[in-house]
């Protein structure tokens, strides 16, 4: 099993660091702040073996240049080809399996357009590094993609095994659960998880990783077939709900203005 460590950055980002039992170094996911990563590697005396990038936003890519200067321009940096991210030297253009250089881990790349046009996720063993596509209790805003694209992307992720661990890039959980409660107030799993999440944050502990099973139980964006959510949408927007894509679009609109 991977050893995975969260490095808090900025106000609410997590830069995920992982290593396998066989490796003597680490990979980092979405290093928006290079200094945070450098400090961790100095403290642990671990070499940087590679970098995974999910999408082009600066809070996910801002540290690439510094890390390449420190650890070598030949350090593998994987990322979506279509987004032309500076420093990415292992561009990825399709879904499928790749083997991460220097660490030998088989990785499944999943294209998930919506938050950005080229956003990708990485599935390594049971760990899903999903950037800003899926959050605990929520999902990313639609900056470049369409509601239909994001709906399809989230549906794709929801079909992963229930025990898949979900490593999101932001600590947005409490705000997301506050919205989820407004949409599906009578969901017992949501009520229970909200108590747990508040307790974790009160101790300044991450609410992550989540799991696919948990998100299917509490995340309104993965629960569009819930009659309570459909009723909430119909009341909020004063219109009949015809299909899941419409439900998603309205739910995202509601969350954007919540």
Curated annotation (Swiss-Prot):
The protein's enzyme class: hydrolase
Xref: Gene3D superfamilies: Ribonuclease Z/Hydroxyacylglutathione hydrolase-like
Cofactors demanded by this protein: Zn(2+)
EC number, as in UniProt: 3.1.2.6
GO biological process: methylglyoxal catabolic process to D-lactate via S-lactoyl-glutathione
Subunit text: Monomer.
Biological role stated in the UniProt entry: Thiolesterase that catalyzes the hydrolysis of S-D-lactoyl-glutathione to form glutathione and D-lactic acid.
Record's protein name: Hydroxyacylglutathione hydrolase
Organism: Shewanella halifaxensis (strain HAW-EB4)
Gene, per the UniProt record: gloB
């Amino acid at each position: 099993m991977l050893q995975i460590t969260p490095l808090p950055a900025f106000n609410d980002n997590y830069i995920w660091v992982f290593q396998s039992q066989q490796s003597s170094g680490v990979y980092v996911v979405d290093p928006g702040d290079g200094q945070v990563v450098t400090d961790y590697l100095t403290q642990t005396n671990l070499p940087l073996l590679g970098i995974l990038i999910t999408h082009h936003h600066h809070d996910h890519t801002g540290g690439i240049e510094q890390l390449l200067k420190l650890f070598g321009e030949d350090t593998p940096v994987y990322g979506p080809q279509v987004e032309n991210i500076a420093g990415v030297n292992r561009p990825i253009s399709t879904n499928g399996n790749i083997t991460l250089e220097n660490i030998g881990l088989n990785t499944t790349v999943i294209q998930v357009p919506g938050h950005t046009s080229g956003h990708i996720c990485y599935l390594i063993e049971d760990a899903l590094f999903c950037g800003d596509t899926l959050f605990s209790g929520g999902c990313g805003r639609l900056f470049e993609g369409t509601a239909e694209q994001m709906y399809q992307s989230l549906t794709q992720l929801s079909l992963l095994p229930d025990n898949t661990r979900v490593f999101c890039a932001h600590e947005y959980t409490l705000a997301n659960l506050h919205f989820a409660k407004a949409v599906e107030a009578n969901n017992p799993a949501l009520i229970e998880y909200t108590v747990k999440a508040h307790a974790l944050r009160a101790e300044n502990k991450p609410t992550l990783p989540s799991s696919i099973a948990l998100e299917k139980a509490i995340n309104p964006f993965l629960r569009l077939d819930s009659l309570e959510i459909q009723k909430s949408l119909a009341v909020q927007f004063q219109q009949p709900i015809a299909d899941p894509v419409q439900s998603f679009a309205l739910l995202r609109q509601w969350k954007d203005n919540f």
